[in-house]
Amino acid sequence: MASSASKFIKCVTVGDGAVGKTCMLICYTSNKFPTDYIPTVFDNFSVNVVVEGITVNLGLWDTAGQEDYNRLRPLSYRGADVFVLAFSLISRASYENVFKKWIPELQHFAPGVPIVLVGTKMDLREDRHYLSDHPGLSPVTTSQGEELRKHIGATYYIECSSKTQQNVKAVFDAAIKVVIKPAVKQKEKKKKQKPRSGCLSNILCGKN
């Protein structure tokens, strides 16, 4: 029987600037896509959520991905229970930076904290008008996202669209499950104990 007292979970979103972290948080907390002013960083927010019969108080922390915030951003990592690490499915650079920048930063400042990997802007990956306006764009595929998840040891990989709200709730449900199901975390930790050798073909091989 679930306890009536809610468990507090601190969830911190990280990732390159302009990948849609703030939009995702606004969409999740307000159930609508922001069409007017979008702040650089979303105000900290907490909400009571029931996941699999367990009531949790989910605290959401947004962070700015730009280099100007490199010294301040890690201050938000203290006490984090889970990270939502986001990249844009239409930005190969943000995908590569998950491995090149964000994983090293999280391992340095918050080692051992579980990660949910998220590919944002899913709607634009199949948008013919958007793709025709951006010739040469190489969207990240689902299989490439899953390969990255395995390589960094993230517990889940989820693709979402804040504009259509598809899978936005699933992102944060997954973040909660990572914390309330320690057995899953232990299984993933065992996988991370033996890091893969060689390069990740879709991220680093053949790239500068």
Swiss-Prot record:
It comes from the Eukaryota. Disulfide bonds: none annotated. It is found in: Membrane. Although this sequence has a C-terminal -CXXX, it is palmitoylated at Cys-205, rather than prenylated. GTP binds at residues 15-22, 62-66, 120-123. GO terms for molecular function: GTP binding; GTPase activity. InterPro entries: P-loop_NTPase (IPR027417), Small_GTP-bd (IPR005225), Small_GTPase (IPR001806), Small_GTPase_Rho (IPR003578). A motif (Effector region) lies at residues 37-45. It is a lipid-anchor. Its main location: membrane. Keywords: Abscisic acid signaling pathway, GTP-binding, Lipoprotein, Membrane, Nucleotide-binding, Palmitate. A lipid is attached at C199, C205 (S-palmitoyl cysteine). GO terms for cellular component: cytosol; plasma membrane. GO terms for biological process: abscisic acid-activated signaling pathway; negative regulation of abscisic acid-activated signaling pathway; small GTPase-mediated signal transduction. The keyword Nucleotide-binding applies. Acts as a negative regulator of abscisic acid (ABA) responses. Interacts with ICR1. Binds to SPK1. Belongs to the small GTPase superfamily. Rho family. This is Rac-like GTP-binding protein ARAC8.
